[in-house]
């Protein structure tokens, strides 16, 4: 989970929270530049996919209030050109490296920045159209992050209606994009989402027992409407990579992919979510994760396919 690759903060009162320690100010272009520079090392370890979100994730990791303003959309659903520029650099590099990107559209800490449901629909349409115009074929759409979190202000982003948005993106893309949504830690997708989705996204936050992770995958396959499709944990804040049984191995043992969520501490060292982020493999926890990825994938360190 590296959703802050295009992060910025348009709120003057909080922008200084993310200042780099060496310069004393926040720089969104530097953030993306360093993200892109780190991608080949991730790929060399066998990593095949990353996650981004057009409204990011919580830059504090976990907090009740989210006063910052990080959104690739204007209040009316228009697209912000500067965000698209940063996004294109990451998507282009991922394509060069043979990596997929799970791209989220909306996040519950920022969806209120869109003034009404019409703006949400406009934002979704414009983001989808932009992806189609660019011709990207390695991007999967997560229409929103954790649709069952009660903080969503727009009904169409909540569990009982989010399938409508999934179908809207599918129709607009003429079924050329793969689309789904994710649920909060420990939750299993609802039937309406299972029937509408091309792949299913689970979260392991709050699930400390690897056996529960395995059970979540099995339960998901029992939801009415399920047919063979990829199941992916794109967020889990449990590690234990030195243990023979951990959440990552439990998910993979059920033929589900697993996503590493390491929030960090806004110190340009720890984690991959709280800015300013050091996107390198620079801590013991990051090294432990990537070591396990390399072990499980059999990567030799020469897998990156880099085109001129």
Model regions and ranges:
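Carbohydrate-binding surfaces of carbohydrate-active enzymes
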Residues: 285-308
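Active-site mouth of glycoside hydrolases
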Residues: 1-199, 203
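Intrinsically disordered, low-complexity regions
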Residues: 6, 25, 75-78, 260, ...
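Generic hydrophobic, helix-prone segments enriched in Leu/Val/Ile
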Residues: 31-35, 103-105, 127, 213-220, ...
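Intrinsic-disorder/low-complexity coil detector
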Residues: 11, 274-275, 307
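Extracellular glycoside hydrolase catalytic/binding regions
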Residues: 122-123, 138-140, 144-291
């Amino acid at each position: 989970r590296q959703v802050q690759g295009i992060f910025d903060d348009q709120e003057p009162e909080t922008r200084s929270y993310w200042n780099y320690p060496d310069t004393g100010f926040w720089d969104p272009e530097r953030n993306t530049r360093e993200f892109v520079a780190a991608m080949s090392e991730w790929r060399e370890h066998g990593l095949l996919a990353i996650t981004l979100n057009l409204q990011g994730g919580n830059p504090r990791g976990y907090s009740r209030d989210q006063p910052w303003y990080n959104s690739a959309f204007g209040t009316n659903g228009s697209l912000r050109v500067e965000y698209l520029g940063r996004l294109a650099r990451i998507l282009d590099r991922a394509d060069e490296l043979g990596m997929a990107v799970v791209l989220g559209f909306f996040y519950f800490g920022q969806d209120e920045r869109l003034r009404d449901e019409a703006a949400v629909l406009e934002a979704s349409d414009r983001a989808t159209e932009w992806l189609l115009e660019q011709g990207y074929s390695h991007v999967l759409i997560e229409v929103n992050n954790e649709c069952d979190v009660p903080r969503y202000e727009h009904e169409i982003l909540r569990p009982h209606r989010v399938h409508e948005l999934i179908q809207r993106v599918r129709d607009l893309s003429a079924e050329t994009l793969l689309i789904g949504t994710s649920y909060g830690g420990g939750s299993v997708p609802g039937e309406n989402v299972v029937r509408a989705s091309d792949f299913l996204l689970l979260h392991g936050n709050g699930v400390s027992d690897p056996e529960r992770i395995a059970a979540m995958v099995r339960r998901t396959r029992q939801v009415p409407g399920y047919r063979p499709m990829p199941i992916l944990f794109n967020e889990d804040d449990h590690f234990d990579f030195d243990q023979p049984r951990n959440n990552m191995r439990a998910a993979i043992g059920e033929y589900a992919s697993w996503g590493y969520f390491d929030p960090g501490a806004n110190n340009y060292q720890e984690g991959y979510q709280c800015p300013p982020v050091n996107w390198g493999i620079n801590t013991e926890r990051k090294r432990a994760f990537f070591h396990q990825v390399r072990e499980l994938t059999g990567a030799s360190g020469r897998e990156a396919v880099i085109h001129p």
